[in-house]
Design a protein with these regions (language model features):
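Conserved PDZ fold ligand-binding element
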Residues: 132-154, 309
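Small-residue-rich helix-interface/hinge motifs
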Residues: 4-77, 278-297
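Alpha-helical transmembrane segments of integral membrane proteins
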Residues: 4-8, 12, 88-93, 259-263
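Functional transmembrane alpha-helices
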Residues: 81, 85, 179, 185-274, ...
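PDZ-domain C-terminal substructure recognizer with occasional recognition of PDZ-binding tails
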Residues: 138, 144-145, 158-200
Length: 334
C-alpha cells in the first residue's frame, strides 16, 4: 500500500470520526449546552483556533476525537452545563454522534446507488440453464409478488429465494403491463439457491434512497448478530480490527476505485455508530445507560461513582485499542 493511500485512508477515517463528534456538538449547541472544545484526533496539538466559546483543534493521533461538553464528566456550576439539562436532552446529546454516523452512512450509500444504479425488481438478464429460463421468464419482466407477498426490494427477493431451499415458489410477474403467474423451484449452485435472474440497475434518486435504507437495515442486522455472537463467544475476536486495520482496508479498496472506498466508508460509519451505542462504560451507550439508571434511582448514583466507572471503562477501551493496533500492525503491515 502506497504512502498516498495510507494518508488518504487516515484522512477519510478522521472525517468519519469528525462526523460522529459533530453530532454531539450540534445537538449540544441546539439544546443550549456549552461546548468547550471540538477536536479531531487525539494526543499532541497540531492546530487550535478559538471561535466564540468553543475551541476547535486538530490533534496528531488519528485514533478518534472528542467534543468537550461543559459538565459532561462531572458537576459544573454553569447554568448551561450538561448536568443541568433534563434527562431527555442528555440522551439526545449522547445519541447524536451515532445518529450522525447513521445519517452519513445513508447519505454515502445514496450517492453510490444514484451514481452506480440501484437495484430494482425488473430483470436485466435471465441465465441459461436455470429455473427462470425454463419457466419462460424473460429479461424486462418485473417481479411483483412471491407466494402472494408483494416485493419491491431486490435484496428481499434474493433472501426469499435463498430461504426457500428449493421449495416451490409462486412468482407473480409483469410483462408489458400484463400479469402472469409461474411456479419455480430454486436450483442450488455453489452453496446458494438461485433462479438464474439478474436485476436491472436504475439511476433514480428515489430508488437510491430506498436502497440506501434497505442496505443500512440489513447491515445493521448483520452487525447486531455479530455483536451478540462475539459477546457470547460464538464469534472469533480475530474478526475485530482497530484503526490500523481500518486504514489498511480503506487503502486496499482504493485500488478498486472511489465507489468501493465510499461504500467501505459508509459501512465503517455505520459500525462506529453501533459500537458507540453499546451499553459499555466510556461509550455513548454506557453514558445513556447511566442517564436512565440515575433517573430510575433518583440520582442515588452520584457523579463521582459514574465518573470512576467511565474512567475504568476508558482505560480498558484504550488498552483494547492498543492491543488491536499491535495486532493489526503484525497482521496488515509486518
Amino acid at each position: 500500500m502506497s504512502v498516498f493511500a495510507i494518508i488518504a485512508a487516515i484522512i477519510l477515517f478522521c472525517l468519519l470520526v469528525a462526523g460522529h463528534e459533530f453530532g454531539h456538538y450540534a445537538a449540544a449547541k441546539l439544546l443550549g449546552v456549552r461546548v468547550n472544545e471540538f477536536s479531531v484526533g487525539m494526543g499532541p496539538l497540531i492546530f487550535q483556533k478559538q471561535h466564540g466559546e468553543t475551541e476547535y483543534s486538530l490533534r496528531a493521533l488519528p485514533i478518534g476525537g472528542y467534543c468537550k461538553i461543559e459538565g459532561e464528566d462531572g458537576d459544573s456550576e454553569d447554568d448551561r452545563s450538561f448536568g443541568r439539562k433534563p434527562w431527555w436532552a442528555k440522551v439526545i446529546i449522547l445519541a447524536a454522534g451515532a445518529f450522525m454516523n447513521f445519517v452519513l452512512c445513508i447519505v454515502l450509500l445514496t450517492g453510490i446507488f444514484w451514481y452506480s444504479g440501484a437495484y430494482s425488481t425488473t430483470l436485466a438478464e435471465v441465465s441459461d440453464g436455470f429455473p427462470a429460463q425454463a419457466a419462460g421468464i424473460q429479461a424486462g419482466d418485473t417481479i411483483v409478488a412471491i407466494d402472494g407477498k408483494a416485493y419491491d426490494d431486490w435484496m428481499d427477493v434474493v433472501d426469499a429465494i435463498d430461504a426457500s431451499e428449493g421449495a416451490p415458489m409462486s412468482f407473480t410477474m409483469e410483462r408489458d403491463g400484463a400479469l402472469y403467474v409461474t411456479v419455480l423451484e430454486a436450483q442450488q449452485s455453489e452453496g446458494r439457491w438461485l433462479m438464474g435472474i439478474t436485476c436491472k440497475l436504475v439511476h433514480s434518486p428515489v430508488k437510491a434512497v430506498a436502497q440506501a435504507f434497505s442496505t443500512t437495515r440489513s447491515t445493521m442486522q448483520a452487525m447486531g448478530q455479530f455483536f451478540v455472537q462475539l459477546f457470547t463467544g460464538k464469534a472469533s475476536g480475530d474478526d475485530v480490527v482497530g484503526v490500523v486495520g481500518i486504514v489498511s482496508m480503506i487503502g486496499e479498496q482504493a485500488k478498486f476505485g472511489i465507489v468501493n472506498v465510499v461504500y467501505l466508508m459508509a459501512i465503517i460509519s455505520l459500525n462506529l455508530g453501533m459500537v458507540n451505542l453499546l451499553p459499555l462504560p466510556a461509550l455513548d451507550g454506557g453514558r445513556i445507560l447511566f442517564v436512565f439508571i440515575r433517573l430510575i434511582t433518583r440520582d442515588k448514583i452520584g457523579d463521582r461513582a459514574e465518573g470512576i466507572t467511565h474512567a475504568i471503562g476508558m482505560v480498558l477501551l484504550l488498552a483494547l485499542m492498543a492491543f488491536l493496533v499491535f495486532r493489526d500492525v503484525n497482521r496488515f503491515i509486518l
